[in-house]
Amino acid sequence: MDISSWFESIHVFLILLNGVFFRLAPLFFFLPFLNNGIISPSIRIPVIFLVASGLITSGKVDIGSSVFEHVYFLMFKEIIVGLLLSFCLSLPFWIFHAVGSIIDNQRGATLSSSIDPANGVDTSELAKFFNLFSAVVFLYSGGMVFILESIQLSYNICPLFSQCSFRISNILTFLTLLASQAVILASPVMIVLLLSEVLLGVLSRFAPQMNAFSVSLTIKSLLAIFIIFICSSTIYFSKVQFFLGEHKFFTNLFVR
């Protein structure tokens, strides 16, 4: 092998490495256990390149002259695919984050909101707990293998440096699924808190000397924790595992 072909092979390898990097990078920014709050940028970027180097040979890639002519457009396409894939993989974490926010809003504990280091947003304490809970169940149930399978599936649907179309119109379906699942999972606690509000209202009507507002937060918090304790080992745990088997649906929701 002469020097020119050696440099050409290095050039091709770097192009492939950057193409895979642009698809993987959004995953490390959106997933709660891989973003800035958990892994520092000085460590995360080399890890992305290391994972990308292992995925280069996952499929056959034809690099022709058109790739070099439209390299910026193709890199932008890889970023879009990575973003859509990140949205699909982050869906269970966003759902449980919304569940915690809804429950804290209903029990009147949003005053304790603080900056969540895993998401970088102002969030309630229960939302952070549910986010970490979903991440633990996700990883315990083989989440990293699921992520690699989803990446592999994305390359089968939309190969590297090839043309593919996006069904961006289905973003409304994605948002509907996010909101509906959050309300469904939070509904047991919401129903119990609504009944407690009715009982506290009756109590304040017949015993006005007892300030129902001063004890409402304590009572509703105890009831919410009790219902969460019952649902966490059944409904919530199985719901996270349900999303682990739906990578084909979520990936095909956007890319064809």
UniProtKB/Swiss-Prot annotation:
The portions of this protein that span the membrane are 13-33, 37-57, 79-99, 129-149, 183-203, 217-237
Give its localization. Cell membrane
Stored Pfam families: Bac_export_1
Under the cellular component aspect of Gene Ontology, which terms does the record hold?
Answer: plasma membrane
Q: How does it sit in the membrane?
A: Multi-pass membrane protein
InterPro entries documented for this protein: T3SS_IM_R, T3SS_SpaR/YscT
Answer yes or no on keyword Cell membrane.
yes
Q: Does the keyword Hydrolase apply?
A: no
Instruction: List the keywords (alphabetical).
Output: Cell membrane, Membrane, Plasmid, Transmembrane, Transmembrane helix, Virulence
UniProt-reported outcome of changing I168V: In plasmid pMYSH6000, plasmid pCP301 and plasmid pINV_F6_M1382
Q: Name one GO biological process term.
A: protein targeting
* Protein family (similarity comment): Belongs to the FliR/MopE/SpaR family.
Task performed by this protein: Required for surface presentation of invasion plasmid antigens. Could play a role in preserving the translocation competence of the ipa antigens. Required for invasion and for secretion of the three ipa proteins.
Tell me the NCBIfam families matching this sequence: fliR_like_III (TIGR01401)
Identification of the protein by name: Surface presentation of antigens protein SpaR
Q: Which organism is it from?
A: Shigella flexneri
Provide the gene name from the record. Answer: spaR
